[in-house]
Structure formats: C-alpha cells, structure tokens
C-alpha cells in the first residue's frame, strides 16, 4: 500500500484547486491534488461549456504564473457592458446602463476566457512542477484529521499524509462534510443554462446582461464571432427551455436577447445547473480549510464566482507561504484564522450584492421596477459612481493579496 507525506493535500482539481496547487508548488511546498476526473476528459472540448470573465486582479495572478501569455490569444477583452431591462411595465421606460473602458484604468473591463483553455494552461504548468503530484480518477474514501496531522485514504488504497487538507471539491462537498463543516443553503428556485454560440453580427467586445422577470440573461463576447451565454430562469421554465430542440432553443434565446447578434448557431453543447446561495458556518477547522465553490456559491448575475475563488487562492497561498517561511505550522488554527479573517469581508460583500441584485432586477413588481429605473438613470449620469463600481469589480480594491497586485510572494 503506497503511502506519501506532503505539506498540503488538495481535494478537487478544478481551476481554483489547481491554481492553489501550482502557486504552492512553485514556492517549495510539496502538494498532492486528488481529482476524480479522468485525465483524458480534461482536454476534451465537449467536457467544457463554461466561460469566465476575468477581472484585473485575476489576470495579474495568471500573469505572475506565466499563464496569461499562454491563454492571451484565446481570450477576448470586454470593452463595454450594457445592462438592460428586458421588459417594460406600464408606462415605465425600460432602463439601460452602460459601462465602457473609459471608466477603467486599463483599456478593457474584463477578459473572457473559455474554461478549457484556462484549465489546459494550468495543468501544463502543473505537469512541469516537480513538487506537485496530480492524481486523476481518484476519490477519497476516508478522511482523518487530528491535532498533529491528516490522513486521506483513496479508493485505490493509497494513503496520503499531510499537514493540511484543502477542500476544493465544489458543492455539495464530501470533504467539508467529512470535516464536520456545515453549510447554509438558500435555493433561488432558478437554474442557469450555459453554452457557446456563433453569431452573424460582430459583438464588438460588448457584454450584455438583460434583466428578465424570471432571471437575467448574460451574453458575453468570446474570440471571433462567438459568445457565451448564461440564461437564468425559474427552474420549471429553464427545464422546458433546455429540453427544446436546438432550433427552437435558439429562437427563444434570440428573442430573449432581442436579436442583437443576428442569426445564431450553437457551437457547444448546452448545460444546465441549479442556482443557490451557499455559505458555510465556518471555512476552517484544525488542519482543514475550504475555498472556491466549496466555501461560497453565489448567484451568477455578476459573473464573479471564479474571481471570488481566485481571491481565495491568492489569500490562502500568501498566508501559507509566508507562515511556512516563519517556521509556523501551516495547518494550525492560528495560521488558518489569518486566512479566514482576511477573506470574510470580501466574501460577505459579494454574497450580499449578488443576492440583492437578483432580487431587485429579476422582479416584476411595479414599485421595484420604478425605483430601479430611477436608480439606473441617476447611476448612468454619475461618472463617480461608475468609477467606483468598476474599481470594485476589478478585484483591486481593499486589502488584497500580493498576487492580485501582480507581485511575487
């Protein structure tokens, strides 16, 4: 029976878990990543339908890791964001709000990247790092944690000892459950359909989010005449739309999108997943910590889920690396509390904002629409407020980790 001792064992090989492994491995820590996915699926285009809007902080981190140069040619900058009311009520004028790169310190607002290209670039870097052992097609069957060490038993009989376990296996999380971490879960009774389509009319680097009564529809530009869509509806309606044949689905999508891109055609398969707000009662225990979707699932209305997870990665990596250099026990609560306290305000703020935005914008109540319309009119005329929102969305405000500033640890 094979046994191994490492500094950190990471359960879950998604983008967040893989990024953490790479940063820690490049800084001298011995890492094991346990991923239930098969390796051949990682590079199968049919396996991926998601795309991500990376903010400046996330791009800075990827640049430090020399990943940005690999994916840059596959990325698509967003120069303009249009927020638009999808339906008017009574005599209320539908609102529109426009953000352009004039409000950004850079010449873009976000960069769109398809999940497959980002994951492939990270894995290629991991494969070249001798400090990282990446175990594919592996599942944890037993998880033991005591005051001095941790032990994981895999389904192939392999045993892994480590100073710290990081749960990055999404939600619901088997690792968090085994560690005794409980989550508070609130269902929005909504589901999102995601995918990629080709279109006739160029997007001109414009992202559009249309607020419909049953949920938001986001159309996000990709390289070429292609865009990613995230279409959120009440679950019953989402199921109906998802089960349509491709022709009828595209007709309904184009109608909801107000035919802004002309003729459209599906490029990827489409996928659907339920939307919920999920937060843990705590993110750390002795020798155990959770990050990414395992620590917080938020509404996709602002497209900030991955950026929030990357901020987790940057903060945890900085805490662990600097603590290890000081000779501290990286699995101790003393060290992990630094991470927990650092991330609390940011996560709470994003959770509150996304929850509030969904309730306000996806509501057919007359008074709420009226108030929203007035608010957006005032916001559209205020450069100061727009600058504030762009600054917050950039991931560069507040007490941020060094990696998000583009600084090495």
Task: List each model region and its residues.
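Conserved N-terminal helical subregion
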Residues: 3, 63, 75-178, 186-191
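N-terminal Rossmann-like FAD-binding beta1-loop-alpha1 element of flavoenzymes
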Residues: 6-33
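Conserved Rossmann-like nucleotide-cofactor binding loop
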Residues: 16, 39, 172
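Glycine-rich FAD pyrophosphate-binding loop
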Residues: 25-50
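N-terminal FAD cofactor-binding segment of flavoenzymes
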Residues: 46-88
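Conserved FAD-binding catalytic core of PHBH/FMO-like flavoproteins
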Residues: 62, 161-263, 267-270
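FAD/FMN-dependent oxidoreductases across multiple families
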Residues: 237-326, 330-334
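C-terminal helical "tail/cap" subdomain of flavin- and related membrane-associated enzymes
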Residues: 318-409
């Amino acid at each position: 029976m094979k046994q191994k001792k490492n500094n950190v064992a990471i359960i879950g090989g998604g983008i967040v878990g893989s990024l953490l492994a790479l940063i820690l491995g490049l800084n001298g820590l011995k890492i094991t990543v346990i991923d239930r996915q098969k390796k051949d699926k990682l590079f199968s285009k049919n396996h991926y339908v998601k795309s991500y809007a990376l903010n400046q902080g996330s791009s800075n981190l990827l640049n430090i890791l020399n990943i940005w140069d690999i994916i840059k040619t596959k990325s698509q900058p967003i120069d303009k964001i249009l927020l638009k009311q999808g339906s008017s009520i009574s005599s209320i004028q539908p609102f529109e709000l426009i953000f352009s790169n004039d409000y950004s310190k850079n010449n873009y607002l976000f960069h769109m990247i398809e999940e497959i290209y980002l994951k492939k670039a990270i894995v290629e870097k991991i494969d070249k790092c001798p400090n990282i052992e990446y175990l594919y097609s592996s599942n944890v069957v037993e998880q033991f944690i005591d005051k001095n060490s941790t032990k994981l038993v895999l389904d192939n009989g392999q045993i892994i000892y480590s100073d710290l376990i990081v749960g990055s296996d999404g939600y619901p999380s088997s690792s968090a459950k085994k560690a005794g971490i409980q989550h508070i879960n609130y269902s929005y009774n909504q589901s999102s359909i995601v995918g990629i389509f080709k279109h006739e009319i160029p997007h001109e680097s414009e992202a559009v989010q249309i607020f419909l009564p049953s949920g938001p529809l986001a159309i996000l530009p990709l390289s070429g005449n292609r865009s990613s869509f995230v279409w959120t509806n009440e679950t019953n309606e989402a199921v109906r739309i998802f089960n349509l044949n491709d022709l009828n689905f595209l007709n309904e999508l184009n109608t909801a999108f107000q035919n802004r891109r002309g003729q459209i055609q599906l490029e990827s398969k489409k996928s659907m997943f339920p939307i919920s707000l999920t937060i843990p009662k705590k993110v750390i225990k002795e020798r155990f910590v959770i990050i990414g979707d395992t620590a917080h699932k938020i509404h996709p209305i602002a497209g900030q889920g991955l950026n929030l997870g990357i901020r987790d990665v940057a903060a945890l990596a900085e805490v662990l690396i600097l603590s290890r250099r000081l000779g501290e026990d990286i699995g101790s609560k003393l060290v992990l509390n630094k991470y927990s306290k650092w991330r609390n305000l940011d996560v709470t703020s994003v959770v509150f904002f996304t929850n509030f935005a969904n309730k306000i914008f996806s509501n057919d109540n007359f008074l709420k629409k009226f108030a929203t319309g007035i608010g957006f009119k005032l916001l559209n005329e205020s450069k100061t407020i727009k600058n504030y929102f762009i600054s917050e969305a950039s991931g560069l405000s507040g007490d941020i980790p060094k990696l998000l500033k583009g600084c090495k640890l």
